[in-house]
Amino acid sequence: MKFSIASLVVLAATSAGVSAAALGSVACANEVVADTTYIGENKDVKVTYSHCGVTPLVTAQGTEVSSLHKRQGNSTNVCGAQCNTFCFNPSGGGPNESDCTVIADALLYDSQNVGALFNITASGTSTDKITMQYNSCTTYFLNQDFNNLTYCRTDWSALVTWLASDCNAANNAHGGLCVAADQRWYIQVQHT
């Protein structure tokens, strides 16, 4: 049986018994930007490809750690992979949902006009983090794996929509993240 990424996020959060975590917004220290471009029908969503000098690694339980176990293998397609959702408490200071919708729509537009899949380089490389920003909303995908990953723009779009609507002030949060069950990657949504 096939589930959408949004269904998997709900299932993961529910099965983990997680409504919110004590985890704060995960910050990237000493970030070095390798490239910047704009996406979407109106080219109004800023995209940066970068690397964090101090990488914020997060476990599937939402805990920041200094290292993860190395996995072997080549580039892996992680489209549709389960992830665990964590919201940042307390409420206040989160992104505007409509700004996050612009990013989600830009991802869908590029999925239809550029391609459904994108690649992100291995952890420790100059482009292991992809960040998208529109007005008050920022989302990023961080590869925590030692191999390149392939992910779906439609899945990222669904997660942006989910996190912006579920991890908001009405739910006593100000953004959140979804960490892959195998800890290879996470996607975060936060205020710019």
Model-found features: residue ranges?
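Fungal secretory targeting signals
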Residues: 1-29
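Mature, structured extracellular domains of secreted fungal proteins
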Residues: 21-192
